[in-house]
């Protein structure tokens, strides 16, 4: 695989630097940090450490990553715009209701990275590769959980994945977030957008 990319969570000093800069520019502002799932990174803990002694900073674990975290942040921002006098407790109470409604999952096009990361045995990798099996990974309680297996081409599996997520309950069709990684075919990406519209998503 060549050189595997690595990540590291932000340190308390990183957060303190940003919080102090914002506070210097806008001393009357309250900072609300909607954090990446704390199960997957140390960032939320670092934020809480940095918030100590800074009574204008509040940090909350969104229990999501990527598009899920973004959706929680965007909906919270809309609430604040509509309710400018809301307290932090009221805002976070609303944020919790958003988190309870967000669904997030993905289907990897290639299991090689799961294998390289130690999340898949050689036998399981070989069997899944030969049978064209692709797992559905969902974010549940902040954790990555394999919930279902799809079989066939990536196009077929991607559509089955969307059907699986839509079947989970009452869906808000006003918006959907589709995230793609580098290397995904334009054909597959275009098909997912068309299929989402066919299902009624705006």
Show the residue positions of the predicted features:
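N-terminal glycine-rich anion-binding loop in soluble enzyme alpha/beta folds
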Residues: 1-16, 20
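Mixed-charge interfacial surface used for oligomerization/domain docking
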Residues: 2, 20, 25, 29-30, ...
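A short beta-strand-to-loop transition that corresponds to the Sensor-1 phosphate-sensing loop
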Residues: 37
């Amino acid at each position: 695989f060549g050189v595997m990319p690595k990540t590291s969570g932000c340190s308390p000093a990183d957060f303190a630097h940003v919080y102090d800069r914002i506070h210097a520019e806008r001393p009357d502002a309250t900072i609300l940090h909607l954090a990446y799932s704390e199960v997957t990174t140390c960032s939320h803990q670092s934020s809480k450490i940095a918030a100590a002694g800074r009574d204008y900073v509040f940090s909350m674990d969104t229990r999501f990553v990527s598009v899920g975290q973004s959706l929680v942040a965007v909906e919270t921002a809309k609430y604040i715009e509509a309710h400018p006098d809301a307290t932090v407790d009221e805002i976070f109470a609303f944020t919790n209701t958003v988190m309870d409604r967000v669904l997030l999952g993905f289907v990897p096009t290639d299991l090689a990275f799961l294998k390289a990361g130690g999340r898949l045995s050689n036998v399981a990798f070989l069997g899944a590769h030969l049978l064209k099996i692709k797992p559905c990974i969902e974010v549940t309680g902040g954790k990555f959980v394999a919930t279902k297996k799809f079989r066939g081409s990536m196009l077929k599996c991607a559509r089955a994945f969307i059907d699986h997520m839509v079947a989970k309950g009452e869906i808000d069709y006003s918006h959907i977030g589709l995230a793609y990684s580098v290397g995904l075919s334009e054909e597959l990406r275009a098909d997912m957008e068309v299929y989402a519209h066919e299902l009624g998503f705006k």
